[in-house]
A protein has these predicted regions:
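Structural cue for short, hydrophobic secondary-structure segments
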Residues: 72-75, 111, 255
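Mobile cap/lid helix-loop segments that gate and shape the active-site cleft of serine hydrolases
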Residues: 29-37, 201-244
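N-terminal cap/lid segment of alpha/beta-hydrolase-fold proteins
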Residues: 7-65
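C-terminal catalytic histidine-bearing segment of alpha/beta-hydrolase fold enzymes
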Residues: 256, 263-274, 278-322
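Short beta-strand/loop motif that positions the catalytic acidic residue
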Residues: 249, 254-258
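Short, surface-exposed "cap/lid" segments of acyl-processing enzymes
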Residues: 61-101
Length: 322
C-alpha cells in the first residue's frame, strides 16, 4: 500500500508513532469490506478459569472437520489488545477480518484473549510465563472440545503470533516447563502441533525503547530475567541442551517481518534469533519479508483486498506442512 510507504517516509518506523496513522489508513478499507468480513460467523468460548480466558472461533468455509487449525495471538505490547479491538474507527472488524480471511483459505481459526500486564490502560496482572500458560490452555481446550469434530479425528494445529503475541508462542515453544506437554502434541494426542508462524516479534529487548522498561520488568522480572526469558535467551538455553528440535517438541517455524518494521526493536532481534536457531538446529528457518507493510498493518490488511499477500503465503505454508 502506497500510503504505508509514505507513512514510513514521513513518520519513520517507530511503533507508537505509526500506530494510529496506520489504523486511519486501513479503517476505510475494512469498512468497505464489512459485509464480506462479517459473512464468516464467530462463536465465543471459554478456555480457562480466568475471566480473560475466552476465544473466538471462526470455522473453515470448507470442511471444518478436517481443515488445519490456526490459533492466532495478537499483539499489543503485552499491555493492550483484544480479540475484537474496541477502536471506534475500526467498527469491531479487527480481528474478525483475520478470522474471516483464514476461514476463506480453508483454515479454521481461533483467536484467544490472553492475560495482559498491568498498565494505565488496565491489565490482568500477567507475569511470566502466563503467556505460555495461556497458549497451553487453548491447546488443552482444543484437545477436549467436540465443537469442531465429534469423531475424535486428529487435528493439525498451527500457532501464529504477532508482536507480543509471538512472545507468548515463543515462551510455550522454548520454555522447559512446557517440554513434556509439547512432546505430547507430537504423539498420539488428537491435536498435532505442526508449525508456528512468528510475525514481527521482538525476540529480544536489548534495543527496546526506554518506555518499555516498566512493562518488561513487570512481566519478565529483573534485567537478568529479561535476558534469560526473552525468546532469544530461551533459544540460547535450548542450544546448550544439545537436543534436537524434534526431541524438544518444537515444530517448524516460519518467521515473518515487515519491510517497514523498526530495525532496533524488530529486525535486528529477528536476524539474531534466526541465525542462532539455524546454528543450533543445523537447518534453515524460513524467513519471509512482508513487502509494503509496517509493524502494525499486516493483520489489519487482511480481508481488505490489498496487502494480503503475506496472509496467502502463511496459509500456503500451513497447507504445505499439513
Amino acid at each position: 500500500m502506497e500510503a504505508l510507504k509514505n507513512l514510513s517516509l514521513t513518520t519513520g518506523t517507530s511503533i507508537m508513532e505509526i500506530l494510529f496513522p496506520t489504523i486511519k489508513i486501513l479503517a476505510p478499507h475494512l469498512q468497505k469490506n464489512r459485509n464480506a468480513i462479517l459473512s464468516v460467523p464467530r462463536s465465543t468460548h471459554t478456555y480457562g478459569s480466568h475471566p480473560r480466558q475466552t476465544l473466538d472461533l471462526y470455522p473453515s468455509s470448507t470442511a471444518s472437520s478436517t481443515s488445519p487449525i490456526l490459533i492466532f495471538f495478537y499483539g499489543g505490547g503485552l499491555t493492550r489488545g483484544d480479540k475484537i479491538l474496541e477502536v471506534p474507527i475500526l467498527d469491531k472488524l479487527v480481528y474478525h477480518n483475520l478470522g474471516s480471511f483464514f476461514s476463506k483459505q480453508g483454515i479454521t481459526t481461533i483467536i484467544p484473549d490472553y492475560r495482559r500486564v498491568d498498565s494505565e490502560t488496565g491489565g490482568e496482572g500477567a507475569i511470566y510465563p502466563s503467556g505460555g500458560e495461556d497458549v497451553s490452555a487453548v491447546l488443552h481446550w482444543l484437545s477436549k472440545t467436540d465443537l469442531l469434530d465429534g469423531k475424535g479425528n486428529k487435528r493439525e494445529v498451527y500457532l501464529m503470533g504477532n508482536s507480543a503475541g509471538g512472545l507468548h508462542i515463543a515462551t510455550y515453544l522454548l520454555e522447559p516447563r512446557f517440554l513434556e506437554e509439547r512432546k505430547s502434541w507430537q504423539g498420539e494426542a488428537n491435536v498435532s502441533l505442526k508449525g508456528a508462524v512468528e510475525v514481527g516479534v521482538p525476540f529480544s529487548f536489548e534495543e527496546a525503547l526506554a518506555g518499555r522498561n516498566d512493562m518488561l520488568e513487570k512481566y519478565y522480572g529483573s534485567d537478568k530475567d529479561i535476558l534469560a526469558r526473552c525468546p532469544y535467551g530461551l533459544l540460547k538455553a535450548v542450544g546448550e541442551s544439545k537436543k534436537s528440535r524434534e526431541e524438544l517438541g518444537i515444530p517448524r517455524l516460519l518467521v515473518m517481518n515487515s519491510e517497514y518494521d523498526p530495525v532496533d526493536e524488530i529486525l535486528n532481534p529477528n536476524d539474531a534469533f534466526v541465525k542462532l536457531g539455524e546454528k543450533i538446529w543445523e537447518e534453515k528457518i524460513e524467513v519471509v519479508k512482508i513487502e509494503g507493510h509496517n509493524h502494525i498493518s499486516p493483520p489489519m490488511a487482511l480481508s481488505t483486498g490489498e496487502g494480503e499477500e503475506w496472509g496467502e503465503k502463511a496459509a500456503a505454508w500451513i497447507k504445505i506442512n499439513s
